[in-house]
């Protein structure tokens, strides 16, 4: 790469105010991102950076060098969207109210302070992490072997039971022996379906397309009375938890707005349970089912071992589990999309050496899975699932922007600003995921309804098919 390379203008289309194309592109972007980005890249001659309009006018970043540049910029250079938004997706009023989605920080509207507050809450509960993880996991398998899967035969629905029990006990103390019971699982699943439809709606930046979007969502019916009732069940459980008075006091002392604080916690605990844990178990289960020889090796490594957050952090003791975990993070990172607005004119590098002009006010969309399949960094097999990829090559982990940032100079900091996943910032998310993976490998035999599909074009950033499900799950003998 050289600073002497010609500076190029991103090619592609940003559509006029009367065009319906932004609405159509948003639908394809959200439902079949692999197909959408493949078509966009081909349309723009294979360029790693190009204009697109999936509901919003964006400049798309798709290779490793540009992604690394993106994640290393402080909020004085690239800052988060205003409001409760993730690109064209907007949090619904019924779900989040006036609360802040404190997952990806910015300097605007106190997002940064809200995320710092969530980090402080997790640190308050850090000592309870291992005990609550073991309690929730033991109960999950005890119930599974006693009662079977019941109606919850998709991988997501099954493991959301384990993750919701853990997260709600860890953060709020719900489900502890002799304490406040967990809210009904059916209410949690209703509020946190795999497609996140209760949480988000679509808001497009061109008037005609946005009108069509609003009509389509109105026809679909919005948040149902059943969903509203389940939301209230979860909010009441949060407000009644033993930790709530302490969390309220901490927030008041922080100077942050307290309006809809309960909804902010519902959002955070729901996202951690669903996208950070249950979805990752889809990737774990599907990848292991597609790689039976590796599964046998992993079982040999894990059988008879006590798995705790501390023990699984030892990559030398559990090299296969560690490498498997990082390969999951590489191909299936979360969140998949990041939207940032340029605070000044910028020049973006790429893996090919080409450089692209970005101007103040441009919105950049960095697609997390695409930057992790760049052959310039991960080799000719970058699109393949290789669970031993990181064994003997631990430095390659620095090129996986786990939980939204490269390896930081200090925990949770890149360029002096907070970034990425709060649970990772406090140092436990890697361990939690490894325990989830490892206990499943130790405990279960399973058969899938359909063969898992690992194809970063057809199923970009996920394991296919949609609704990946079990035909049978039994305890190991």
From Swiss-Prot:
Gene that this sequence comes from: EAS
Assigned protein family: Belongs to the cytochrome P450 family.
MF-aspect GO terms: heme binding; iron ion binding; lyase activity; monooxygenase activity; oxidoreductase activity, acting on paired donors, with incorporation or reduction of molecular oxygen
UniProt catalytic activity: (9S)-hydroperoxy-(10E,12Z)-octadecadienoate = (11S)-hydroxy-(9S,10S)-epoxy-(12Z)-octadecenoate; (13S)-hydroperoxy-(9Z,11E)-octadecadienoate = 11-hydroxy-12,13-epoxy-(9Z)-octadecenoate
Keywords, ordered alphabetically: Fatty acid biosynthesis, Fatty acid metabolism, Iron, Lipid biosynthesis, Lipid metabolism, Lyase, Metal-binding, Oxidoreductase, Oxylipin biosynthesis
Enzyme Commission (EC) number: 4.2.1.-
Binding positions for heme per the UniProt entry: 421
Function: Cytochrome P450 epoxyalcohol synthase involved in the metabolism of oxylipins 'ectocarpins' natural products, such as hybridalactone, ecklonilactones and derivatives. Isomerizes the hydroperoxides into epoxyalcohols via epoxyallylic radical.
Lipid metabolism is among the record's keywords: yes
Protein name: Epoxyalcohol synthase CYP5164B1
One GO-annotated biological process of the protein: fatty acid biosynthetic process
Recorded metabolic or biological pathway in which this protein acts: Lipid metabolism; oxylipin biosynthesis
Organism: Ectocarpus siliculosus (Brown alga)
Cofactor(s) the record lists: heme
Superkingdom classification of source: Eukaryota
């Amino acid at each position: 790469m050289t600073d002497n390379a010609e500076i190029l203008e991103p090619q592609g289309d940003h559509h006029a105010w009367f065009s319906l194309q932004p609405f159509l592109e948003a639908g394809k972007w959200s439902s079949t991102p692999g197909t959408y980005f493949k078509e966009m890249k081909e349309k723009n001659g294979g360029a790693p950076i190009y204009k697109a309009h999936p509901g919003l006018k964006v400049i798309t970043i798709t290779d490793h060098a540009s992604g690394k540049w993106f994640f290393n910029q402080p909020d004085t250079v690239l800052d988060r969207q205003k409001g409760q938004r993730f690109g064209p997706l907007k949090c619904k009023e019924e779900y989040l109210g006036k609360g802040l989605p404190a997952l990806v920080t910015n300097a605007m509207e106190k997002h940064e302070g809200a995320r710092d507050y969530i980090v402080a809450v997790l640190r308050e509960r850090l000592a309870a992490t291992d005990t609550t993880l073991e309690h929730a996991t033991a109960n999950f398998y005890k119930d599974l072997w006693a009662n079977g899967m019941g109606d919850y035969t998709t991988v997501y629905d099954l493991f959301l039971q384990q993750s919701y029990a853990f997260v709600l006990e860890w953060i709020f103390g719900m489900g502890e022996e002799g304490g406040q019971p967990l809210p009904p699982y059916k209410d949690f699943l209703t509020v946190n379906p795999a497609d996140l439809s209760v949480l988000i709606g679509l808001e497009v930046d061109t008037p005609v397309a946005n009108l069509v979007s609003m009509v389509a969502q109105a026809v679909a019916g919005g948040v149902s009375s059943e969903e509203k009732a389940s939301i209230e069940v979860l909010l009441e459980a949060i407000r009644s938890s033993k930790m709530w008075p302490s969390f309220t006091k901490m927030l008041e002392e922080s100077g942050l707005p307290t309006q809809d604080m309960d909804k902010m916690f519902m959002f955070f605990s729901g996202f951690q349970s669903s996208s950070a844990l249950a979805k990752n178990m889809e990737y774990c289960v599907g990848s292991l089912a597609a790689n039976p020889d590796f599964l046998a090796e992993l079982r040999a490594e894990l059988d008879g071992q006590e798995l705790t957050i501390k023990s699984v952090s030892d990559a030398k003791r559990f090299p296969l589990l560690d490498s498997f975990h990082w390969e999951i993070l590489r191909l299936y990172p979360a969140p998949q999309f990041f939207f940032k607005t340029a605070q000044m004119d910028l020049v973006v590098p790429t893996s090919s050496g080409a450089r692209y002009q970005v101007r103040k006010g441009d919105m950049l969309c960095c697609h997390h899975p695409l930057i992790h399949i760049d052959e310039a960094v991960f080799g000719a097999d970058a699109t393949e699932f290789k669970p031993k990829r990181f064994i003997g090559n631990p430095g390659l982990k620095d090129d996986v922007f786990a939980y939204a940032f490269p390896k930081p100079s200090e925990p949770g900091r890149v360029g002096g600003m907070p970034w990425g996943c709060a649970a990772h910032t406090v140092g436990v998310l890697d361990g939690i995921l490894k325990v989830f993976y490892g206990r499943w490998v130790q405990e279960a035999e399973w058969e899938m309804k359909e063969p898992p599909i690992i194809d970063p074009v057809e199923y970009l950033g996920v394991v296919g098919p949609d609704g990946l499900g079990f035909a049978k799950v039994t305890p190991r003998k």
